[in-house]
């Protein structure tokens, strides 16, 4: 009697490698868990209490919206046949004949993976989703949720797919030899730059929120960060499209860089501020992960440690020192410092990949022969220049495309919540609160239209008192 896994069965074609398919689906699930529930939890807990529901919902909505757009149009824009040197021909990816066939990327010379196209479509969706959710981190606490709902599909179509096709889908940067092993440019540089631009156009949070924006639940924040870290093994381990040597090296290098960067960031906090910070440790973790992503499977382990050190130092300095000296950086209110933790770290990681990419590891993954980092001589100097040029293209495209998208949305929908809603938060935006505690005193009445000066008068002559344990009692 034929077994359940008999190769002759149509469900198990001859080209299917069950180990590769199982690992790729596992990696996709790990990356998906980074967003759902990882970033949902992290965003909900790292913000001020009144923005917990709104922040979580922005991530939740993006995850769902990206999946639908991805299958209907965007997968083929990023990994389909060429339309332009930086863009693929869009189209639906839900035909069963297409999804059951062997995975392939038409315009690249990557060996066809030994799993179905359905696996590849879903795996790449999880990357598109987390990139879009990262952009949200820059505008938490003031962006109009309706504007965000319009922004997500437009940014996915006109920004993300361009970077993905250009570098991963066989576009001009791929053919030229720019290295981005698993998304230092496509994901982290693009989301950081786009988030910064979005924060500029949406405008800053209210002054009270900018001056005091404590996390509402540090322990949940750590839980979300933990899911993000552990999920990164699928993020970088799944990039080779196989359960092979490169994936093993990538997983080890990923975790080593994250640990190193976290410890470096924490050490700097202790040296300069006298005590370690949980938020700082999480930021260091993220910069280490983002920094190693462009070359995780292409560098030796000692290089991963160096990348961790640089990723824990340079973004810290840019956030703590350069930010305070730049009028532009101070003007733009990047709520979760996505520009520093993702754009700066991703850029540095791409540059360091141009230095440390090992030729013996590059030959296992990359399209061009004799690819190597500058540290190994040969044509490594040219590789470093390619890395810089690739970063410039991704950054400029995201500045232009994100600006155009937001200005177009602004014609129809305000990018920013009304001032009264900004003072109230979740209850105004969603009619829901994260913690339904009696006496919080932040209730939205849609029939009232209180101007800012009236709220200032209320603050001067409050109609409430603080009871035991800080509970606000409305009089």
Swiss-Prot record:
Location(s) in or outside the cell: Cell membrane
Consequence of changing residue 95 to N: In strain: cv. C24
GO CC annotation, single: plasmodesma
Function: High affinity ammonium transporter that may play an important role in moving ammonium between the apoplast and symplast of cells throughout the plant. Does not transport methylammonium.
Gene3D superfamilies for this protein: Ammonium transporter AmtB like domains
Higher taxonomy: Eukaryota, Viridiplantae, Streptophyta, Embryophyta, Tracheophyta
The family this protein is said to belong to: Belongs to the ammonia transporter channel (TC 1.A.11.2) family.
Organism annotation: Arabidopsis thaliana
Tissue spec: Higher expression in shoots than roots.
Keyword Transport on entry: yes
Highest taxon of source: Eukaryota
Entry membrane topology: Multi-pass membrane protein
Keywords, in A-Z order: Ammonia transport, Cell membrane, Membrane, Transmembrane, Transmembrane helix, Transport
Induction: By nitrogen deprivation in roots.
Gene transcribed to yield this protein: AMT2
GO MF annotation: an example: ammonium channel activity
Protein name: Ammonium transporter 2
Database matches in Pfam families: Ammonium_transp (PF00909)
Transmembrane segments: 27-47, 55-75, 120-140, 148-168, 183-203, 218-238, 254-274, 279-299, 302-322, 336-356, 389-409
One BP term from GO: response to nematode
């Amino acid at each position: 009697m034929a077994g359940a896994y008999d190769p002759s069965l149509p469900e198990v074609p001859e080209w299917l490698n069950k180990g590769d398919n199982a690992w790729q689906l596992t990696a996709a699930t790990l990356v998906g868990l980074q967003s759902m529930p990882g970033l949902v939890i992290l965003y909900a807990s790292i913000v001020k209490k009144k923005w917990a529901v709104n922040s979580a919902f922005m991530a939740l909505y993006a995850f769902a919206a990206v999946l639908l757009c991805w299958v209907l149009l965007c997968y083929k824009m990023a990994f389909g046949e060429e339309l332009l040197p930086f863009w693929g021909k869009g189209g639906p990816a839900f035909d069963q004949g297409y999804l059951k066939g062997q995975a392939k990327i038409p315009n690249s010379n990557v060996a066809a993976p030994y799993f179905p196209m359905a696996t590849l479509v879903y795996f790449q969706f999880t990357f598109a989703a987390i990139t879009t959710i990262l952009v949200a981190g820059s505008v938490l606490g003031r962006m109009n949720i309706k504007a965000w709902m319009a922004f997500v599909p437009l940014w996915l179509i006109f920004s993300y797919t361009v970077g993905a096709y250009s570098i991963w889908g066989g576009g001009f940067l791929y053919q030229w030899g720019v290295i981005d092993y698993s998304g230092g440019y496509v994901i982290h540089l693009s989301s950081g730059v786009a988030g910064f631009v979005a924060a500029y156009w949406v405008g800053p949070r209210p002054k009270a929120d900018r001056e005091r924006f404590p996390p509402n639940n540090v322990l949940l924040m750590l839980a979300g960060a933990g899911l993000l870290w552990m999920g990164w093994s699928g993020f970088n381990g799944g990039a080779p499209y196989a359960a092979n040597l490169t994936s093993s090296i990538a997983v080890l290098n990923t975790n080593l860089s994250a640990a190193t960067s976290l410890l470096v960031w924490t050490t700097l906090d202790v040296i300069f501020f006298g005590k370690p910070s949980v938020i700082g440790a999480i930021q260091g973790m993220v910069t280490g992960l983002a920094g190693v992503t462009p070359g995780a499977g292409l560098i030796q382990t000692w290089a991963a440690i160096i990348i961790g050190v640089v990723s824990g130092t340079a973004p810290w300095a840019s956030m703590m020192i350069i930010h305070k000296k730049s009028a532009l950086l101070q003007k733009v209110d990047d709520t979760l410092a996505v520009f520093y933790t993702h754009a700066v770290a991703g850029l540095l990681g791409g540059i360091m990949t141009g230095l440390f990419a090992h030729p013996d590891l590059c030959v296992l993954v990359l399209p061009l022969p004799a690819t190597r980092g500058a540290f190994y001589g040969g044509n490594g100097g040219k590789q470093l220049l390619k890395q810089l040029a690739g970063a410039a293209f991704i950054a400029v495209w995201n500045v232009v495309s994100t600006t155009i998208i937001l200005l177009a949305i602004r014609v129809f929908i305000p990018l920013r919540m009304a001032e009264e809603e900004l003072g109230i938060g979740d209850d105004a935006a969603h009619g829901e609160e994260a913690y339904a505690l009696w006496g919080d005193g932040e209730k939205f009445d849609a029939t009232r239209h209180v101007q800012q000066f009236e709220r200032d008068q209320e603050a001067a002559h409050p109609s409430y008192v603080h009871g035991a344990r800080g509970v606000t009692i409305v009089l």
